[in-house]
Amino acid sequence: MLTFIGLGLFDEYDISLKGLEAIREADMVYAEFYTSCLMGTNLEKMEKLYGKKVFLLSREDVEQHPDWLSKAKNRNLCFLTGGDTMVSTTHVDLRLRAEKLGIDTRLIHGASIASAVSGLTGLQNYRFGKSASIPHPYESRRGTRIISETPYDTIKQNLELGLHTLVFLDIDKEKGYMTVNTALELLLEVEEKRGEGIMRGAAAVGIARAGSEKPVIRADYAENLKDFNFGKPLHILVIPGKLHFLEAEALVKLAGGPVGFMKEVE
């Protein structure tokens, strides 16, 4: 049996009682934190709470050489991830591979950043469109700096439909955790190149350390928000579409947004 367990948003105490019980009953416990991680804890604290050794897996261990998976044929294994399990396609792929090997799988869900963002900002969850991910820029073989324009396109499509866009920010082993500030700078750089008027004057909301005792939620126009200090990671970004009057009021009162938002409601 392979049990996928979502650990929630911030620290070791975000796990559900059902998830904690499954870990304590498992023969072996594995975890990956390259798709998401808990910034308010570490492996030592997790192991102390769980009463179990946790084996940390790399991207290669999960996606390319999951030799450990075969152990689940005759043992109870747990696979831990930040947030809610199965949000990442990597985890869906791993589950399908387990099923093909004849391994039974089980899911134990955890708090998701998608639902947390709605709660923290006051933006209604059914008004979100397709999400986007902003990767760090990279250099081509010729040394040209490449910025992905896919997130810009996704935001554009959602805005045309009046929908909000949840924008995930890159976690890179070498380049580190992308900030809201960097993400907005990259989107504005694409805007400067394409000149389609998507980001200039657009509203934006940044969230830092969701799930902690003192998360930071700040709303403003993108050009202003890029200069706000959100502090330590993890960060996530929202580009709102058309605002319902309750959403606009929430952004002003709960996220310090400008009163001008109240004039832009449906």
Curated annotation (Swiss-Prot):
Metabolic or biological pathway, per its Swiss-Prot or TrEMBL entry: Protein modification; peptidyl-diphthamide biosynthesis
Spans through the membrane: none
GO MF annotation terms: diphthine synthase activity
Key words of the record: Methyltransferase, S-adenosyl-L-methionine, Transferase
GO biological process: methylation; protein histidyl modification to diphthamide
Main function: S-adenosyl-L-methionine-dependent methyltransferase that catalyzes the trimethylation of the amino group of the modified target histidine residue in translation elongation factor 2 (EF-2), to form an intermediate called diphthine. The three successive methylation reactions represent the second step of diphthamide biosynthesis.
Annotated protein name in UniProt: Diphthine synthase
Species annotation: Methanosarcina barkeri (strain Fusaro / DSM 804)
